[in-house]
Design a protein with these regions (language model features):
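DNA-binding interface regions
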Residues: 1-139
Length: 139
């Protein structure tokens, strides 16, 4: 397991990255589809920040966590940092596909760190954004 901490001068944690155990990385590289699904969730409890997650899917459509990271916010810089750390763990994967929502930071990170990977958007996120747009136009 790789653990990487980045701190400010004042000692506050601004970023943390955890690459899950070697077994999961080996499973992803050897046995799973070359597909990574990436998303983030905002932490709203005592510890604020953004939890970034990268998962893969096995042949039985089971979700396998590959890496997780926590940063102060969901920005292009934090996504590039997360993707670079992910690439350190998995290396260059041929025919890699990355699925995410349409966050500009993820798109920028995919283009910068995995330029040869196919980057697609999650249909569920596209549908929810369309429904939200329709509700706003009715109001």
């Amino acid at each position: 397991m790789e653990l990487c901490l980045t701190t400010l001068i004042e000692g506050f944690l601004i970023a943390m990255y955890v690459c899950n155990c070697i077994r999961q990385i080996k499973s992803f590289l050897c046995y799973m589809r070359p597909l990574i699904i990436i998303d983030a969730a905002h932490l709203k409890g005592h510890y604020q920040g953004t939890n970034m997650v990268a998962v893969g899917m096995d042949g039985n459509n089971q979700i396998i966590p590959i890496a997780t990271g926590v940063s102060q916010s969901e920005t292009a810089e934090s996504w590039i940092w997360f993707m670079r750390k992910l690439k350190e763990c998995i290396g260059e994967v041929p025919n890699l596909a990355i699925i995410s929502d349409r966050h500009y930071g993820i798109t920028a990170a995919c283009n910068a760190v995995f330029p040869n990977a196919f980057h697609g958007y999650c249909c569920r996120h596209l549908m929810l954004n369309r429904e939200r747009h329709n509700e706003m136009s009715i109001l």
